[in-house]
From Swiss-Prot:
This is Nephritogenoside. Keywords: Glycoprotein, Repeat. Can induce glomerulonephritis. An unusual glucose trisaccharide is attached to the N-terminal Asn that lacks the typical N-X-[ST] motif. The carbohydrate moiety is necessary for nephritogenic activity. Transmembrane segments: none annotated. Glycans are attached at residue 1. Residues 5-19 are annotated as: 5 X 3 AA tandem repeats of G-X-X. It comes from the Eukaryota.
């Protein structure tokens, strides 16, 4: 999800960002 960044680990709403929550 762009909310967390651009590219990272999967988050609760799909691909998160740099944080990768």
């Amino acid at each position: 999800n762009p909310l967390f960044g651009i590219a990272g680990e999967d988050g609760p709403t799909g691909p998160s960002g740099i944080v990768g929550q």
